[in-house]
Each structure stands twice: as structure tokens, then as C-alpha cells.
């Protein structure tokens, strides 16, 4: 009686594990025969917006430079 209970418990545990894992305990295919539904395209990662691009320093080069504080005259800001 005790042996039968242990076998039933092990069978129930095995069935619950295979149901939760979705049958992933089976060996996976090697990937030589890809199906159309399983093909995924790799996505290129996007770089930062204001990082160094074609010009070093990004958009900073095109901003108006602040005037030096050693000038004579009214303050521009």
C-alpha cells in the first residue's frame, strides 16, 4: 500500500512538472530546420541620442558658444 502511494505521488509530481514546463524537459531541436513561425530577426541596438555620432561631441558643436567673461561691455545675459 505504501509503495503504491509513493508511485502515485511520483507520477503526479512528474506530470505536474511536465505540465508547468510545457514539455521543455524533452531535448530541443538543433535549429537546422527552422520553421517560419519560430524565426526571429535580430534587432540592432540604438545608440544614445546625444552621444558621439558622425561628429565627435554630438550636437554640442552646433550650439552658440557663450561669450567669454573677460570682455568689456554690457553683459549679454
Curated annotation (Swiss-Prot):
One of its GO terms (cellular component) is perinuclear region of cytoplasm. The keyword Acyltransferase does not apply. Keywords: Angiogenesis, Cleavage on pair of basic residues, Developmental protein, Gastrulation, Hormone, Host-virus interaction, Secreted, Signal. Its main location: secreted. Residues 23-41 form a propeptide. One of its GO terms (biological process) is apelin receptor signaling pathway. Residues 43-77 are annotated as: Disordered. This is Apelin. It comes from Homo sapiens (Human).
Amino acid at each position: 500500500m505504501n509503495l503504491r502511494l509513493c508511485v502515485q505521488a511520483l507520477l503526479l509530481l512528474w506530470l505536474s512538472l511536465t505540465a508547468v514546463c510545457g514539455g521543455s524537459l524533452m531535448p530541443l531541436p538543433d535549429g537546422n530546420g527552422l520553421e517560419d513561425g519560430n524565426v526571429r530577426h535580430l534587432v540592432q541596438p540604438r545608440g544614445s541620442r546625444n552621444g558621439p555620432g558622425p561628429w565627435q561631441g554630438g550636437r554640442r558643436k552646433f550650439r552658440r558658444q557663450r561669450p567669454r567673461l573677460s570682455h568689456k561691455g554690457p553683459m549679454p545675459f
